[in-house]
Amino acid sequence: MLCSGSLRRLDLPDKAAVASGAGFQGISVYLHEVRDARRDGWTLASLRRMLDDLGLAVAEIDGQVSWLPGEPTSERAASVDEALEVASGLAARSLTALEWNGHRVGVDLDAAFVVDAFGELCSRAGSQELLVHIEYFPFSGIPDLSTALAIATGAACENGGVMVDVWHHVRGADGGDPDVLVAAAPMVLGVQLNDAAPEASADVRDECMHGREMPGAGVAACGPIAAALRRGGCRAPFGVEVFSDALDDRDPDDAARRVREAARRVLRGR
């Protein structure tokens, strides 16, 4: 599955065409790029027909969703209503839940409050058979696997779990440890493959958005991480998300082929 951020300079219709041409069977879709497409005259129905014609399923609806009470919507942050409308219209498998303001759960945000909010989001998503996964990342208020798992297990919703992004797992408190993922694997509903440079940047946000490596090209144990998840019983689709200025500069068709082949090598244990 091609994660949208790997071809972030393309609009959604062009991105879908490139993904299909490279052999992907699914993509993730950002809410803001659906907004852009609708402004250009597309409807959810016409976007879905286009994706169907290309043989692409929408594996994830990604991006900022204001699921915590009190969070405002914006050009980048969609309401829960909008996110669920898009997910339904595009027949998406899952929805990502992020805490992007850096309000630390258990410090700035009451943990029980967050658990209740996630449970409410899962309840609403469940009415349309949509999975929801919390994506943890180092500069989030949900910075590591244990925090994300505590929220998901506390909410105790059948359709709720966590997203594992390899770069986030490496650069955060988990330090890229594959072993901690075995027990967590049944709760892992989404996986994003990528890799990390040998030396962490002083600006982790900048590295996150501009300096990720292709799967297998850095210091992350991509293969062991994927194997640990499979060994533990994870059945989520594996996506590839490489935010990289170097990748942005490549021809999109070439970039898509490269990320697909890199992910396939990792998953085959090469």
Where do the model's predicted regions map?
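Conserved, mostly hydrophobic/aromatic
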Residues: A19, I27, L51, A87, ...
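A structural motif
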Residues: F24, A92, V188, C234-R235
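Acidic-and-aromatic substrate-binding clefts and catalytic sites of carbohydrate-active enzymes
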Residues: G5-L12, Y30-T43, S66-R76, G102-D108, ...
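A general structural detector for well-ordered alpha-helical segments in enzyme core domains, enriched
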Residues: K15-V18, T43-M50, S79-V86, V114-L121, ...
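Active-site acidic/histidine proton-transfer and metal-coordination neighborhood
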Residues: P13-A17, M50-L54, P69-V164, R171
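Acidic/histidine-rich catalytic cores of soluble enzymes
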Residues: I27, A59-I61, G119-V219
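N-terminal pre-domain/capping segments
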Residues: M1-A92, C157-G161, R257-R270
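Short beta-strand segments at enzyme active-site cores
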Residues: S28-V29, A59-I61, R93-E99, V132-E135, ...
